[in-house]
């Protein structure tokens, strides 16, 4: 069951892009960038559409929140693939953390892999690096 967005978001009319002020910036962790490079071209095209038309417009409305070790992260499903991301609403940023296939019970499962990266501290480091690039220096 999909959760409704916490704050109302104006969704552009069909074929219309959100204005720069309304759209979320999409940022990628190094691991997510590597995940995307490893995808087949047609899957990358599908992913690009998901990112531009859905997650950049209304990431809460098109995603589902995760629980457990990945609480505060969201997922969007397309085919057998998942995009795992974190939303920073005050910054209007969606940080893409991982892209991969759901293989329940398999060590290659996207959720198991991301939990492992999170437990190691590498995910926090990568997110901090992504945010550091967009935050003004103080």
Residues covered by each model-derived region:
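A generic beta-sheet turn/junction motif
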Residues: 78-80, 89
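A generic structural signal for beta-strand entry/edge sites
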Residues: 23, 73, 91-93
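A short, surface-exposed loop/turn module that caps and links secondary-structure elements
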Residues: 52-77
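Short acidic loop-to-beta-strand element that houses the catalytic metal-binding Asp/Glu
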Residues: 82-84
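Enriched for short, Lys/Arg-rich terminal
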Residues: 1-13, 19, 86-138
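N-terminal "first-domain core" detector
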Residues: 2-39, 43
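Negatively charged, low-complexity tracts enriched in Asp/Glu with abundant Ser/Thr
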Residues: 38-54
């Amino acid at each position: 069951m999909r959760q409704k967005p916490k704050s109302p978001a104006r969704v552009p009319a069909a074929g219309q892009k959100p204005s720069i002020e309304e759209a979320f910036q999409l940022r990628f962790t190094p691991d997510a960038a590597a995940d995307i490079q490893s995808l087949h071209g047609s899957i990358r095209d599908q992913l690009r559409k998901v990112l531009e038309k859905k997650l950049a417009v209304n990431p809460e409305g098109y995603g589902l929140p995760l629980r457990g070790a990945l609480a505060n992260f969201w997922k969007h499903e397309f085919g057998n693939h998942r995009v795992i991301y974190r939303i920073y609403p005050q910054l209007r940023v969606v940080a893409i953390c991982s892209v991969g296939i759901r293989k329940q019970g398999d060590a290659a499962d996207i959720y198991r892999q991301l939990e492992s990266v999170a437990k190691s501290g590498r995910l926090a480091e990568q997110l901090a690096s992504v945010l550091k690039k967009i935050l003004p220096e103080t």
